[in-house]
Amino acid sequence: MIQKVGLVALALVLGAGGGQAQTFEGSVALSYGNAPFLSTDDDEERLSERGYKASGYLGATFGDWRVFGDINVYNRSIGDQDFDQYAPGGASSFGLHAGRNFGNFYGGAFVGRNRFQGTDATTINDYVSGSLYGIEAEYSMGAISVFAQLGRAKMIGDTGDTEFTGKFSKVGIAATVDRFVISAEFEQGNSPLNFEDSGDEGDYRALGIAIDYQITDRVIGTLSYETMDIIANTEDSGSDEFFGIGIRIPLGATGAKRNNLTTSYRPGLAAAWAETLD
């Protein structure tokens, strides 16, 4: 059903724009660093492993209409450790976005999927997938942009036991200062009926801060920090962090434009953490 909605949205955009793309945009990015974590199931000891993040998006505009796809990968090296006893090895997302520009305002919708570790997989550290969809908007005021997403996700890691099924939302701001782009975003999600155990509620809250520096028209240096708190109940909780330094390569006519409306992988990561905390 979700895939059908996405295809319909894409068809509407192409039809409304006459099928002739006016501009193309995109970027690819890679950052490398540390991915610390803490779990109440591990005596609340803060541990750290190496990690990386990779992302990319590609889109086009058709008149006032816009369509783009994106992929985002977060990876933590956990070696031969079992994720349900140690920490998740990360999560990834890919999505399709479509909407319309109304002057400085963009409004649209998105559909996508997450890949994350779950015990329903064939082997203990293998991945399962789940779906998500929602609406999104962005408003630009010169050098400042504000953006938001509201969605729903269904991420089942262990059928009948651990999952994240519920709503999530994200708000953020990005400001351009000379060659710098400074951005911050906050995301939260709630799984009201099932999380760590069947019938138990669970939440996550995440904060991300990034600084981009435009070295040349086609090379951007990046610094980023993200932290995510996962709360199963008063006894079980965890935190997941990432410090990274990297590079982003803009593509297309829009050059250094930043894509703020990414498809979140955090509902899937929360479902993986639910299994770790169980």
Where are these regions (language model features)?
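Gram-negative bacterial Sec-dependent N-terminal signal peptides
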Residues: M1-A21
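Residue-level signature of outer-membrane beta-barrel architecture
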Residues: L58-F62, A98-F102, Y139-M141, I173-V177, ...
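Residues that define the transmembrane beta-barrel architecture of outer-membrane proteins
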Residues: R46-A54, N75-S77, P88-F94, N101, ...
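Repeated loop/turn-to-beta-strand initiation elements of outer-membrane beta-barrel proteins
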Residues: F24-E25, F62-G69, F102-A109, A143-A148, ...
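Short glycine/proline- and aromatic-enriched beta-strand/turn motifs that initiate or cap beta-hairpins
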Residues: Q20-Q81, W273-D278
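Gram-negative outer-membrane beta-barrel proteins
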Residues: Y32-E44, S48, N75-F83, N104, ...
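Flexible, glycine-rich linker and terminal segments associated
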Residues: N194, Q214, R218-I220, M228, ...
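Transmembrane beta-barrel strands of outer-membrane/channel proteins
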Residues: V28-N34, G69-N75, A109-R113, Y139, ...
